[in-house]
Amino acid sequence: MKKMISRRNFLAAAGVVAAAGVLTACGGSSGDTIKVGVLGPLTGDVSVYGQAVVNGATLYLKQVNEKGGINGKQLEIIAMDEQGDATQAVTCFTKMCDQGITALVGDVTTTPTLAVAAESADYNMPMVTASATAEAVTYDAE
C-alpha cells in the first residue's frame, strides 16, 4: 500500500525548502552552522500544524546536513512554541534572533504570522510561512 503525503506535511516541507533556498542565496551565517528558526504553536488547539512544520523542517535539514550542508555549513533548527498567540510569537522571534537565526520558517497561522512579519522586516530577516493563508500575509500596503 502506497502511503500518501499529507497536505500539512507537504506544506511544512515546502516552507523549509523555500527557506533553504533563501539561505543559499544569502550565504548563511558566520561559523560552522546556519541557524534556522522554526516558529509555531507546539502546544494548544492548533499544535498539530506547528508540530508538522517542526517535523518537516527537522527532516529536511537532516537531509541537507547529510549531503554536506549549505556551502559546507551544517544547519541547526531553533524551534519555539508561540502557543498560538501573536504577542508570544514576537517574543519567541526576538529570542531566536538573539540566538543568531539567519532565516525563519513560520509562523503557521495568520495572526502570529502578521505580528512576526512586521518584526522580521525590522531585522531584515527572510521569513517563509507554509500555511498562513490570509490575503494580508502576502499583501504589502506600501
PLM features per residue range, with description:
Residues I101-E142:
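Extracytoplasmic ligand/sensor domains, especially the bilobed periplasmic-binding protein
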Residues V54, T58-L61, V90-F93, T113-A121:
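Extracytoplasmic/secreted envelope proteins and their assembly/folding machinery
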Residues N55-I77:
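Signal peptide-proximal N-terminal region
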Residues G37-G56, M80-A86, V108-T111:
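Extracytoplasmic "Venus flytrap"
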